[in-house]
Amino acid sequence: MSMLFYTLITAFLIGIQAELHSESNVPAGHTIPQAHWTKLQHSLDTALRRARSAPAAAIAARVAGQTRNITVDPRLFKKRRLRSPRVLFSTQPPPEAADTQDLDFEVGGAAPFNRTHRSKRSSSHPIFHRGEFSVCDSVSVWVGDKTTATDIKGKEVMVLGEVNINNSVFKQYFFETKCRDPNPVDSGCRGIDSKHWNSYCTTTHTFVKALTMDGKQAAWRFIRIDTACVCVLSRKAVRRA
């Protein structure tokens, strides 16, 4: 919006300069009609009203829609170094967090390009038995509306929400895990001896390969996402008599 405003102001100043230039070339005894100035002012007011009335959501939608025109070669997803179990390109929403152990679902008649074997790794994961608890409570969700992220150099980059692959629009999803509550119990982490330890739960991060915008082209970058919830401990100071 600010860029459009400055553009309109620049056009207005150029118009004024043009009018002044034409006025200097007018023969003596003649004046510029007031109608010219009125018309110029009216044009500027109309343009400014249209700029202010344009919904921000509509402008954002047009910008987001441009990513659909970015075509990606599907052969890129066959490179093992670009795969990540936490990044998924799909034409439909992935299963809920409770069902993320199986990513072998069909998408538009074909499996996702970067589908992984998370189910094989998760099948051997121990199931919590009755009476067993985690020191921290976490929640895992598929995030499909990520627009910006921090890359491995600490710079904020634009994340591609959608790309065109084989004439189909695929959305980029990220499987993120974060803490549900920094203090699951009053003393901090669950099961920690609060008499001798201070504790709290915190979300940790890792870097995954994701498609981002580099100028007007798509580029792979390492971006930071939430991946775990861990307990942080610090020993309490010993009080000496």
From Swiss-Prot:
It is found in: Secreted; Endosome lumen. GO terms for biological process: cell surface receptor protein tyrosine kinase signaling pathway; modulation of chemical synaptic transmission; negative regulation of neuron apoptotic process; nerve development; nerve growth factor signaling pathway; neuron projection morphogenesis. Its main location: secreted. A 1-acyl-sn-glycero-3-phospho-L-serine binds at K209. Coiled coil: none annotated. A 1-acyl-sn-glycero-3-phospho-(1D-myo-inositol) binds at Y173, K209. Disulfide bonds join C136-C201, C179-C229, C189-C231. It comes from the Eukaryota. InterPro entries: Cystine-knot_cytokine (IPR029034), Nerve_growth_factor-like (IPR020408), Nerve_growth_factor-rel (IPR002072), Nerve_growth_factor_bsu (IPR020425), Nerve_growth_factor_bsu_mml (IPR020437), Nerve_growth_factor_CS (IPR019846). Keywords: Cleavage on pair of basic residues, Disulfide bond, Endosome, Glycoprotein, Growth factor, Lipid-binding, Metalloenzyme inhibitor, Metalloprotease inhibitor, Protease inhibitor, Secreted, Signal. GO terms for cellular component: axon; dendrite; endosome lumen; extracellular space; synaptic vesicle. The keyword Oxidoreductase does not apply. Residues 1-18 form the signal peptide. GO terms for molecular function: growth factor activity; lipid binding; metalloendopeptidase inhibitor activity; nerve growth factor receptor binding. Belongs to the NGF-beta family. Homodimer. The homodimer interacts with a single NTRK1 chain. The homodimer interacts with a single NGFR chain. The NGF dimer interacts with a single SORCS2 chain (via extracellular domain). The NGF precursor (proNGF) binds to a receptor complex formed by SORT1 and NGFR, which leads to NGF endocytosis. Both mature NGF and the immature NGF precursor (proNGF) interact with SORCS2 and with the heterodimer formed by SORCS2 and NGFR (via extracellular domains). The NGF precursor (proNGF) has much higher affinity for SORCS2 than mature NGF. This is Beta-nerve growth factor. It comes from Gorilla gorilla gorilla. The gene is NGF.
